[in-house]
Amino acid sequence: MRRAWAVAAVAGAVALMSCGGSSTTSKAAWTAKHGAALAALNADLDTARATLSTLQRPDILGSCTQLRDSLLEARKGLPVPDPPADAALRTGFDAVDVGIEDCIQGARGPNIPQLEKSFRTLREADTLMEVATRTIDNWK
């Protein structure tokens, strides 16, 4: 699965480099409206990843539920007017979503293998969100 995420990230990066876009909404306007939600998502992603390491089910369930709420709020920023940034952000969001579901189900279980899978998936999601952040930073 890790290899699949890496391949998807590389393929996405290549596709992003070949795309251009014009937008009616400026980067500054989009960031002013949605930047706080994106920052909250990234912070909650870090918290969820750290909490998974503790193996404390109530804490894991709480942090992954908070991450789910942050993801729902951050998705309100889609579509991003810049096609490369939009594609990168959607890829990151999808990865976070997969990790959240495994996290919540594993914490409710308890299902240690599912929590381990969530940890790996959220680590990959963190990398994809970093790519998305850099892509947004490069938006002209």
Give the location of each predicted region.
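C-terminal motif of bacterial Sec signal peptides marking the signal peptidase cleavage site
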Residues: 15-18
